[in-house]
């Protein structure tokens, strides 16, 4: 090989290496709620920040900074008894400035699973107006291909319906991509097929079939 040919080959290899390295600093995996002491209960804020990153409204490098700002606005009021978790109704209000349409959907009329029943109890507890919510029976079916949902789950294998306020809430971002439903968990920072998330966490989570639906 001529010297000029070797030089060109070296440039190509160097360029490919630089490109592969640059991918690790942008996009997924994102910062997670486990990265800082302040963010251990900030899954709602991180789910919102992930939505902003996925829809190119913020840089992936700004996820943690954005989540911290959002978290201060969406935490439950101390009197609510939910500690430092995120209030879904505050998430709805905060999301309005980032999405073209925002709606809360849940199995309101005929809750079947413990998670669905918990959401109905919390719904009744806060005196929410049912006319402002959409009744669904399956989250994946209700989610459009161009929508995202900040989904609510309970990070326990079981739900305590006798003491509904004792159930912590966890938020994940769920969406369709290339015909497959994906979930992006703030505890992990990287998307995985929805079915993998369910199969890998069935002893850890109780699914509530509810969440804040966002469309850019």
Provide a role label for each language-model segment.
Residues 160-166, 173-216:
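Noncatalytic regulatory segments and standalone regulatory/sensor domains
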Residues 10-16:
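Bacterial N-terminal signal peptides
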Residues 1-8:
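Bacterial N-terminal signal peptides that target proteins for export
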Residues 44, 109-115, 136, 142, ...:
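Mature extracellular "passenger" or substrate-interacting domains of secreted, surface-exposed proteins
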Residues 121-181:
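Active-site-adjacent substructure of cysteine-protease-like catalytic cores
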Residues 20-98:
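Active-site-adjacent structural segments surrounding the nucleophilic cysteine of cysteine proteases
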Residues 9, 63-64, 114-115, 119:
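Short amphipathic alpha-helical segments that mediate assembly, nucleic-acid/protein binding
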Residues 95-130:
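Surface-exposed acidic loop/strand-edge motifs in secreted or periplasmic proteins
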